[in-house]
């Protein structure tokens, strides 16, 4: 019996490239043995609703084609359900943090090859209050860059748009008083930023979590304490090389459960999109989603040795 795949795609991502190549993508998957159909989103929330519908119709594979926001919506549509379908990813956004972390090719046909080859691995996801995320949750003024950067600027200069907007915001940054409880520990004090990471790639920084494991059941918690502009600039430079973890203004920890609160009105960034405001409870859901990935992520030590799946090893 042929497997059934449903593509959920954002037609505006990647300068509408996927929309143009959709017929070729459908043919490629059909030739590989998948009975395939597609759905184009029109507004925020569409991908979640369509993922839920596809679950009810018992699709074997869901393929998210778009940016990290589209992928986040698809995950939110299946995370609470039993017998979740395998997830394929076609990175079409500006940064594509999750795709980078899993070494998924940025070209459409290359990403489809990963799905067709059939290797998959189970990865952790995060639950924040009543919603889910697959890559990061963050707070602090600088973390608003991804959803405050104009779409036109992103279409012109791509990922560099975030750096342009980020440097524009640096002088305006202010520390806020936070209480962060994590696995029996407490941080109470002023901080500029905090990140909860599930992969090594966050906000375009591919070495922000140099020791990342995608399936160990832990968030990486990064807190940047109150710093002056020069210190913050130095931390960002170190972060581009993965050398920030020992900086005296950086707290770098692992935790399964985290609670964050503040008397300040602080917005959250969840997988690159606006995620509401504090307070927030975070829980790591270990190995919750099965994702198609290239076989080489095992060699990159992104998967825990005791969790290597049989279908991620060449026979």
From Swiss-Prot:
Keyword Transmembrane applies: no
A Gene Ontology molecular function term of the record: ATP binding
Active site: 273 (proton acceptor)
GO biological process: phospholipid biosynthetic process
Any Gene Ontology CC annotation: plasma membrane
All copies of domain DAGKc, residue ranges: 1-132
Paired cysteines (S-S): none
Binding site for ATP: 10-14, 41, 67-73, 94
Keywords recorded for this protein, A-Z: ATP-binding, Kinase, Lipid biosynthesis, Lipid metabolism, Magnesium, Metal-binding, Nucleotide-binding, Phospholipid biosynthesis, Phospholipid metabolism, Transferase
Cofactor: Mg(2+)
This enzyme's EC code(s): 2.7.1.107
Highest taxon above the source species: Bacteria
Cofactor binding notes: Binds 1 Mg(2+) ion per subunit. This ion appears to have a structural role and is required for catalytic activity.
Catalytic activity: a 1,2-diacyl-sn-glycerol + ATP = a 1,2-diacyl-sn-glycero-3-phosphate + ADP + H(+)
SUPFAM superfamilies for this protein: NAD kinase/diacylglycerol kinase-like
Record-stated family: Belongs to the diacylglycerol/lipid kinase family.
Function description: Catalyzes the phosphorylation of diacylglycerol (DAG) into phosphatidic acid. Is a key enzyme involved in the production of lipoteichoic acid by reintroducing DAG formed from the breakdown of membrane phospholipids into the phosphatidylglycerol biosynthetic pathway.
Listed name of the protein: Diacylglycerol kinase
């Amino acid at each position: 019996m042929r497997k059934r795949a449903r593509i959920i795609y954002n037609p505006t991502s990647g300068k509408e490239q996927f929309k143009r190549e959709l017929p070729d993508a459908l043919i490629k998957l059909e030739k590989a043995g998948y009975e395939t159909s597609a759905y184009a989103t029109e507004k925020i929330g569409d991908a979640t609703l369509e993922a839920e519908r596809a679950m009810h119709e018992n699709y074997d594979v869901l393929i998210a084609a778009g940016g990290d926001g589209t992928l986040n919506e698809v995950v939110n549509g299946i995370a609470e359900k039993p017998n979740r379908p395998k997830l394929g990813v076609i990175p079409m956004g500006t940064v594509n943090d999750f795709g980078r972390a899993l070494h998924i090719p940025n070209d459409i046909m290359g990403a489809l090859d990963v799905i067709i080859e059939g290797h998959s691995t189970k990865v952790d996801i995060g639950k924040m209050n009543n919603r889910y995320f697959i890559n990061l949750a963050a707070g602090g003024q600088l973390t608003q860059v991804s959803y405050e950067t104009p779409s036109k600027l992103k279409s012109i200069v791509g990922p560099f748009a975030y750096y342009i907007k980020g440097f524009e915001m640096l002088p305006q940054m202010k520390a806020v008083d936070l209480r962060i409880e994590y696995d029996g520990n407490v941080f109470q004090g002023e901080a500029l930023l905090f990140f909860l990471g599930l992969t090594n790639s966050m906000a375009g920084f591919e070495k922000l979590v140099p020791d990342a494991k995608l399936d160990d059941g832990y968030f990486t918690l990064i807190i940047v304490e109150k710093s002056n502009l020069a210190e913050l600039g130095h931390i960002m430079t170190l972060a581009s090389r993965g050398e920030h973890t020992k900086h005296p203004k950086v707290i770098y920890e692992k935790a399964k459960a985290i609670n964050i609160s503040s008397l300040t009105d602080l917005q959250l960034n969840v997988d690159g999109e606006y995620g509401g405001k504090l307070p927030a409870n975070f829980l790591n859901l270990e190995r919750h989603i099965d994702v198609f990935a290239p076989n080489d992520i095992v060699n990159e030590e992104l998967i825990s040795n005791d969790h290597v799946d049989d279908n991620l090893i060449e026979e």
